[in-house]
Amino acid sequence: MKALTWLWLTSLPADTAKAVKEKYKKEIGKGLDLSITKPRKPEWLRENLLNPFRDWDGREHITAANAKKAADVYKKTIAAIHSVVKQTQGGAADIERLKQELRSTVLNYTEAFNKMDRRTGFIETVEREEIYMVLADLLQTAKQQLESAGVNIDDEVLFRPFHELREF
């Protein structure tokens, strides 16, 4: 195994982590730098497969509680957006009400992260970008779904509450 000098794996299924450790532990004595961290149980993988904040779990400066809260905020935001989009399925929808509900969803999303950050100030540049990109993806998907139902909402209307309220 002359070509392999290091093997670092993180956040992988627990059974895979165990198998890799077992297979390569003999190579450590031959100079292999082996690091297997954050083995994940099937339950964790199921719950976090689609969670864009799953990388927060285990980051040095982010508590497990804040990682879980971020995942919960994401789930609540998706549910709220789906609720808004669903209102357009029956035909005529009150566009102003839809805009207000989306605005409220963005406000709740933003305030949830503000509240989390107020306690410990853990949100740094990378997390700021992740929070914004997750919201951007959710709103872009909502906008596309609304447009397919004949409802057009300006991007600025969707993002304004985030920019106005964000403290982190």
Where are each of the predicted segments found?
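Concave beta-strand-loop units of leucine-rich repeat
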Residues: M1-K18, K26-K38
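Generic alpha-helical secondary structure signal
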Residues: D15-K18, E22, Q100, E129, ...
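Short, surface-exposed amphipathic charged segments that create phosphate/polyanion-binding patches used
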Residues: E22-Y24, N48
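Amphipathic alpha-helical binding modules
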Residues: I28, D33-P42, G121-F168
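Short terminal alpha-helical segments
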Residues: G31-G90, L165
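Residue-level detector of well-ordered alpha-helical segments, enriched
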Residues: K69, V73, E101-N108, I131-V134
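Alpha-helical repeat scaffolds in large eukaryotic proteins
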Residues: K75-Q89, L107-R118, A136-K143
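Short, solvent-exposed, charged loop/turn and helix-capping segments
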Residues: K86-S104, A112-I131
